[in-house]
Regions:
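Juxtamembrane segments of multi-pass membrane glycosylation machinery
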Residues: 44-67, 81-88, 108-113, 352-360
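Transmembrane-helix motifs of polytopic, lipid-linked glycan transferases
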Residues: 63-90, 127-135
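Membrane-interface transmembrane helices that cradle and orient dolichyl/undecaprenyl
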Residues: 130-147
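Membrane-proximal stem/loop segments at transmembrane-domain junctions that anchor or position
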Residues: 224-342
Length: 454
């Protein structure tokens, strides 16, 4: 039966690729050309395929990505099935829940993308995240060294695929700290805590140097990815008033700010043009973010650099990040209140998109789902503190919170950035409900149910 499940998953994903073919989108060219803005792992994956298959590399790419996704879903399904002793029918439901986000982004999102068909880093990040989830759950349930190593490795790979996935490194740190702190008191507890922090710091350092080495080889500069500060300053400019520019001391940076602000104002790219509610603010910034970034900030910087400084693209990116940092330091204290409202609006939509689609009625249901999940998890914890569903739900909520708050700092919380937590949340909810039913059933027949500790 398990082979039938694996075959069904492989058949579904391969058929979706045959039906729709490879998806090339606005960002795809940057991955193919190993752009300075992009993390290294996915461009290297594409380069390897180009070296083997030439210009027809998109077709083996699609097959590999879809097969990888199918296998990852199968492995996570078997892990959950074994831990909760699920029948095959329940394992099939677990697999279907993991497939649904792919259907949702294809048929219910504005971009209409089947993720694992696309030339986007999400196509590699999604199966990697599924395998990270499998290892993180095993780490929570068993805590063996091989699961620590597995979670670490997949955290590093994910962070080298998408910058937002650095949050998995922090989640790993929190898992390990919780395990260490919950252990009996001992002399080595402090050393273990320091060890966890040191390993986490080392992982970030390794990630940074890996990116710099990649850029040295393929872009000729030993530097980190550029454009991060430009992303950060975009929402600050949206949340600012023109007089905030008076706080900028450096003359050229101040002139840049005024020019960018005026361009944004002309296209109504300012909080003043949004509605009063949090949803209105979120809707408006989602419409204006790219307009401000590309047509106001980027256009202003690069036109000036072309005429007065250099036409070298990487140097222009470094200068743009430097100017953006200068703006942020000066205007952030001035625009903090408006920025925070905007940020909360983006986070709100991100939390909704992590488990649903944005719609006035569905938004309320999504918030209710979070509250219900918390209440049911607490009830289960009170009945059976050792239930594996409790840490599973905690992992889901922790990742969703971390992913949403991290992405909202730099850009909009679009569905393709948020869907990683979708399956984990509903799988956790399903397991919490399953465990509660078992507990209530056992209590009803006055028997004690125990599960052998693995």
């Amino acid at each position: 039966m398990h082979l039938i499940l694996l075959f069904s998953l492989l058949l579904f994903f391969v058929l979706m690729f045959i039906l729709y073919g490879p998806g090339v989108y606005n960002d795809s060219d940057q991955y193919i050309k190993m752009h300075i803005h992009r993390e290294p792992l996915y461009p290297l994956f594409l380069k390897l395929l180009r070296d083997f298959f030439g210009e027809s590399f998109l077709y083996p790419m699609g097959i590999i990505q879809n097969v990888f996704m199918a296998i990852a879903i199968y492995l996570l399904t078997r892990t959950i099935g074994d831990r909760f002793k699920l029948p095959v029918s329940m394992e099939a439901l677990v697999a279907c829940i993991q497939v649904f986000p792919h259907i949702m982004t294809k048929y219910f999102s504005a971009m209409s993308v089947f993720v694992t068909n696309s030339v986007m880093s999400e196509a590699l990040a999604f199966p990697l995240f599924t395998l990270w989830t499998m290892n993180a759950l095993k780490l929570l349930w068993k805590g063996e060294k091989k699961h620590i190593a597995g979670t670490l490795i997949f955290s590093l790979l994910l962070s080298l695929t998408r910058g937002q996935m650095m949050v998995t490194i922090l989640v790993f740190m929190l898992i390990m700290l919780c395990r260490v702190i919950s252990e009996p008191q001992g002399r080595r507890k402090l050393l273990r805590i320091l060890g966890v922090v040191a390993v986490t710091a080392a992982l970030f350092i390794i990630r940074t140097y890996a990116v710099k080495c990649y850029n040295l080889v393929y872009n000729g500069r030993f530097i980190n990815n550029t454009y991060g500060n430009v992303n950060l300053v975009t929402n600050m400019i949206y949340a600012s008033d023109r007089e905030d520019g008076e706080a900028i001391r450096e003359e050229q940076t101040r002139e840049f700010f005024y020019e960018i602000f005026d361009k944004a104002w002309e296209i109504e790219g300012n909080y003043s043009f949004s509605g009063d509610s949090l949803m209105d603010r979120a809707d408006h910034i989602e419409q204006m973010h790219d307009e401000i970034k590309f047509n106001c900030i980027e256009d202003t910087f690069y036109q000036y650099y072309d005429k007065n400084v250099t036409t070298d693209y990487i140097t222009q990116n470094l200068l743009a990040d430097e100017q953006a940092m200068g703006m942020m330091k000066a205007i952030f204290p001035k625009c903090f209140k408006n920025w925070l409202v905007t940020y909360c609006g983006i986070v709100y939509y991100g939390l909704v998109r992590s488990i649903a689609v944005v719609h006035p009625l569905i938004n309320i249901a999504a918030v209710g789902s979070y509250l219900l999940a918390i209440v049911l998890t607490v009830l289960l914890w009170k009945r059976n503190p050792k239930s594996p569903a409790v840490p599973m739900m905690c992992l889901a909520l922790l990742f969703i919170a971390g992913n949403t708050t991290a992405v909202a700092l730099t850009i909009m919380c679009l569905s393709r950035y948020m869907i990683y937590g979708f399956a984990l949340f509903y799988l956790s909810g399903l397991m919490v409900v399953t465990e509660l039913i078992r507990e209530w059933h056992c209590a009803k027949i006055n028997k004690t149910c125990t599960r052998k500790e693995e």
